[in-house]
Amino acid sequence: MVIANDEYSIWRTAPDASRLCYQHFCWRELYKSNIHPSIDLTNRPNLRIAELATGHCLWAIQVAEEYPHAQVEASDISLGLMPPKPDLPANLAVRKWSFFDPVPEEWIGAFDLLHVRLVIQPFGGNQDPRSVLDKFVSMLKPGGYLQWDEYDYHNADKNNVYSANDPVLVPNPEVTHNSSTKVWKLIMKTFQWPTEHFDRLADYFSAAGLTDVAAHKKRPPPAVFRAFYEHWYALVAQLLPVLDSMDAGAGQEAKELLMQMKKDAVVDGVYSAHITKFVVGRKPEQ
C-alpha cells in the first residue's frame, strides 16, 4: 500500500508533534549528538547541511545552532509541525518538498551532510528505496556525507531488546513478554513496510557509489531505554485507527497486544525497545 500525501494529515496533529519531539531527544541521547561521531565536518568552507522529512525541524534547528557558520536547509511535504519562521535560527531555511519529487536544480551537488531519519512509512507497499537514495547521493558535494537513521527492522524477533525490573522473576522476557515483538511484526506486515530493503541500506549505499559505509547499531542506553519503549507504545496507539481501517482483524489484534504491552510494563516491569541503526556513507572526492 502506497500512502498518498494527503493521508499524512494524521501525522500533523498535536499528539504526533509531542511524540516526534520525544523521539528526537531519545535519539540524540544515543550519541549525545545529532550528527554521528564518524562524520567530520571540520575545515569545510561554505558548509551546507540538509535534513529531509524534517517533521518538527528540531534536528535541523539544533544543528543550525551548533554550526552557526553553516547554511542549514530543512524540508518536508508539510511545514505544519515546524515553529514559526521568525523563531528559526537565521542560518536555517525551510521549504516544502517531497523526496519522491525531482530534486531541485540548486540542490544538486550542494550539501556537505544530508540527514534523514525514520522514513520507512512512506515506502509502504514494499517500495524499493534505491531510487530515492540515488537522489540523496546526487545532492551531496564530493566528499559529502549521508546519514540515514532507522531502526534495525529486519528479524524483529531478534532485534527487539528487553529490560526487566526483576531479571530473577522474569529471566527471559523476550519469550514470556513478547507482545511488543508481535505487534511490531503485525504492523510491518499490514502496512507492507519494506523491512528487507531497509535492512540492506548499507549495501545500497555502496552500490550507489558511497564509500566508508558503515551501519552503526546501538541498543538504547539505560537512560532512555524506557523512553524508547514509551515512544513505541505511543506510536502503536496512534497507528491503531489507520490499522483498523485497513484490516479490522489486524486492528483488533493490535489493540489486544497494546493492552498486553502496558500490562507487561506496569505489572511485570518489562520494557522493550528497538536496536537503532545509523547508516553513514561518504561521496568520493573528485
Where are these regions (language model features)?
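Class I SAM-dependent methyltransferase Rossmann-like catalytic core
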Residues: 1-46
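C-terminal helical/coil "lid" or tail adjacent to the Rossmann-like core of SAM-dependent
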Residues: 7-9, 174-178, 182, 214-274
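Class I SAM-dependent methyltransferase SAM/SAH-binding core
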Residues: 46-105, 131
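A short acidic, Gly/Pro-enriched loop at the edge of an enzyme's catalytic core
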Residues: 103-114
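Residues lining the SAM
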Residues: 113-120, 149
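A short glycine-rich, Lys/Arg-flanked "PGG" loop and its adjoining helix->strand segment in the class I
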Residues: 130-142
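Conserved catalytic/acceptor-binding region of the Class I
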Residues: 141, 145-233
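Core SAM-dependent methyltransferase catalytic element
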Residues: 208-211, 274-286
